[in-house]
Amino acid sequence: NFPLYGVTLSLPTIIKQLGYKTTTAQLMTIPFYATAAFLVICVSFTADRIHMRSPFMFAAYFLMLLGFALCISSGPPARTYAGVFLVLCGAYPATSCLSVLVANNLAGSYKRAVGIAMVLTMSNMGTSMACNFYRQRDAPHFVLGHSINVGFVVAGLAACSFWIWRYSRINKQRAARRAAGEHLLLTPEELSRQGDKAVTFVHTL
């Protein structure tokens, strides 16, 4: 969420530094949010249909990297505008996918509630840091802010890759255990009490 908060909170400032007046700069943010909202709906619908979210997260991360690359590179204001557009079009779907993944991969009402609360709390704590990434003296390209966010995106890619590898391995192990009939040794109530540790629980990728 650092890239999302960093760019969102500083978006009017970034656009204003491109030569637009304050009122116009506010209006120029509308296409970003309208497109991002549409993409979130499309990604959410498609991910639910195919029961996978990691491909969309990877696509979103790479879209953000491309956007930040355009922002950092020197060029006309239109290039920076396009870069920020790509960043937000990737950041919002990635954030929604992450929130749902946490809910899908934690079983047990208390565990799921605490897990979601922890993720949202840590995400919102990033606001206090992210709003300081884009300083007025770094205008108009804000290389420092964009570079810091690139680091967070790369870290997100690494974490997502590890998470997919880990959960894929667990799913394969549990599939083998189910094939051996291990789940038949327990009652449905016992399996339910095991939550996401149960051999019948399949992690969402």
Identify the function of each model-found stretch.
Residues 46, 102, 136-138:
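Hydrophobic alpha-helical transmembrane and interfacial-helix anchor sites in secondary transporters
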Residues 54-70:
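Structural signature of the two symmetry-related core transmembrane helices
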Residues 109-143, 148-152:
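A late C-terminal transmembrane helix in Major Facilitator Superfamily
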Residues 1-45, 55, 95, 99-100, ...:
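Extracytoplasmic gate region of multi-pass secondary transporters
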